[in-house]
From Swiss-Prot:
Motif LXXLL motif 1 positions after renumbering to this chain: 175-179
Biased composition (Basic and acidic residues): 67-87, 96-117, 240-256
Family: Belongs to the ARGLU1 family.
GO cellular component: chromosome; cytosol; mitochondrion; nuclear speck; nucleoplasm
A molecular function GO annotation: transcription coactivator activity
Protein name: Arginine and glutamate-rich protein 1
Intrachain S-S bonds: none
A biological process from GO: mRNA processing
The keyword Lyase appears for this protein: no
UniProt keyword RNA-binding, yes or no: yes
Top-rank taxon: Eukaryota
Region described as Necessary and sufficient for transcriptional regulation: 78-276
Keyword annotations of the record: Chromosome, mRNA processing, mRNA splicing, Nucleus, RNA-binding
């Protein structure tokens, strides 16, 4: 009886402990599942955030915000996800999220600084490479030119002499043409001067002829006027002579009348008788 009781009690204890173990195992399994789900959710969120950050960094690099304020706003929007949940399904505190945000900003600043440093370093290296390449190319070109000149020295001298002779011939031809143009220009100028002088002489002769004609006309007119004056003077003189003769005649007649020599009065005779 005692053994059966002990066995039954042990069996009941065993069943209770097994039930309790099953419950614990089921709880641990559910917890592990929740942990796994939370881990997956956090991973998916992290991957989404990373993708968002990458896309925003690309958009920032493409659009190039015009000021630090715009970049800070972009960074805040990129680094302000909803409340995070830990593996136990609990929300992470704001302080830890702020710390993570600050840490993330510092890491982004460091990454940006490192990227800018690498870009500057790459630009400096590219510039140095470009300068070195240009210097080497210049040296190589100068060396090749010098070698080519040395090889073709005689040919170059002959070509230079030929070009000098050709230039001399061209210059002589141009000089002769210039002298001929000057001579033709001088002849044309001389002809123009002679033509101008001839025209001036003809104009002077015409003016002299016109003056002589006017003088002759004036002289003829003056002579005619003088003849008229002489004729007038002659007429005046004749008229004066006529008047003088008429006056003398009248005077004589008056004297005759006064003296009685005319037929109108008898003649008076005076005789002296002689005494014996």
């Amino acid at each position: 009886m005692g053994r059966s009781r002990s066995r039954s009690s042990s069996r009941s204890k065993h069943t209770k402990s097994s039930k309790h173990n099953k419950k614990n195992r089921s709880r641990s399994r559910s917890r592990s599942r929740e942990k796994e789900r939370a881990r997956k959710r956090s991973k998916s969120r992290e991957s989404k955030r990373n993708r968002r950050r990458e896309s925003r960094s690309r958009s920032r690099s493409n659009t190039a915000p015009s000021s630090r304020r715009d970049r800070e706003r972009e960074r805040e929007r990129a680094s302000s996800p909803p409340d995070r949940i830990d593996i136990f399904g609990r929300t992470v505190s704001k302080r830890s999220s702020l710390d993570e945000k600050q840490k993330r900003e510092e890491e982004e600043k460091k990454a940006e600084f490192e990227r800018q440093r690498k870009i500057r370093q790459q630009e400096i290296e590219e510039k140095l490479i470009e300068e070195e390449t240009a210097r080497r190319v210049e040296e190589l070109v100068a060396k090749r030119v010098e070698e080519e000149l040395e090889k073709r020295k005689d040919e170059i001298e002959r070509e230079v002499l030929r070009r000098v002779e050709e230039a001399k011939r061209i210059m002589e031809k141009q000089l002769l043409e210039e002298l001929e143009r000057q001579r033709q220009a001088e002849l044309a100028a001389q002809k123009a001067r002679e033509e101008e002088e001839r025209a001036k002489r003809e104009e002077l002769e015409r003016i002299l002829e016109e003056n002589n004609r006017k003088i002759a006309e004036a002289q003829a007119k003056l002579a005619e006027e003088q003849l008229k004056i002489v004729e007038e003077q002659r007429k005046i003189h004749e008229e004066r002579m006529k008047l003088e003769q008429e006056r003398q005649r009248q005077q004589k007649e008056e004297q005759k009348i006064i003296l009685g020599k005319g037929k109108s009065r008898p003649k008076l005779s005076f005789s002296l008788k002689s005494q014996d």
